[in-house]
Amino acid sequence: MSQAPMVREHCERCLNSARWNGNPVLMIVDAAFDSIGLNYFQSVVPKVELFNQQFVATGQVRVLEDLVKADDTELRQIWKNSRSWKVAREIAAHLVWVKQQKKIGDRDALIYWAKNAPLNGWEKDPVGSIKGVGINTYQYLRMMGGVDTVMPDKIVKRVIYEILDTAGIKHPANDIEFVLAVEALAPGTGFRAIEICWMTWLIQSEAGLSRTEKYAALLPKI
């Protein structure tokens, strides 16, 4: 944690569903853009900020319903990948259904979904079953909805596998077992699973600097 001093603060925002100023529309767009595997800080974050400026700040997309109905041609002026927008709109559509069923707001709908979204059988969940939503996007959304968990992506796995190898512990057999293993190991490390997840990303180097150093001014905003 000493290598990533902003991790705990960032994870608190995540667990409080307060990333992107607590705006679920931006959190969903973030996850949808991130789902295609581009560099998060260099590609995804600037485009989410641009979407915020041109659609959210102008009042064009204020709530989840607006995102569901947003014009694809206009959206693709921000981000050209149509699949990302389809993923974003379908996630938003399910959360709109949650809103209506539970008579709650956008943020509470994300939180309610995340708290009730299963890890085992995630592919059968209404969000998990959306084409383009893999286990990493699913887990990322759960994290932004307040769940203390981890994404089984390649960077997190590489770091955790190095730790397991040093301890002589066998690698988990699949993504679900990996997530469960990290959740089980986390208390013994003094960190939460979500902190371990973000720490593995933020200690990575770009241009000779850790991401916490390189993006120090950006992290508090997201």
What do the predicted segments below correspond to?
Residues 1-84:
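Structure-specific DNA junction-binding interface
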Residues 26-39, 89-94, 143, 194-207:
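Short, hydrophobic/amphipathic alpha-helical patches that form generic packing surfaces
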Residues 32-33, 115-167:
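Catalytic DNA-binding helix-loop module of base-excision-repair DNA glycosylases/AP lyases
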Residues 32-33, 172-222:
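A basic, often C-terminal nucleic-acid-binding module that engages the phosphate backbone, implemented
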Residues 35-46, 96-104, 204-211:
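Short helix-capping/linker segments at secondary-structure and domain boundaries
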Residues 43-46, 151, 155, 173:
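Alpha-helix N-cap and coil->helix boundary residues
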Residues 54-130:
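Alpha-helical ds-nucleic-acid-binding substructure associated with the helix-hairpin-helix region
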Residues 61, 165-173:
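Short, positively charged loop/turn segments that connect secondary-structure elements
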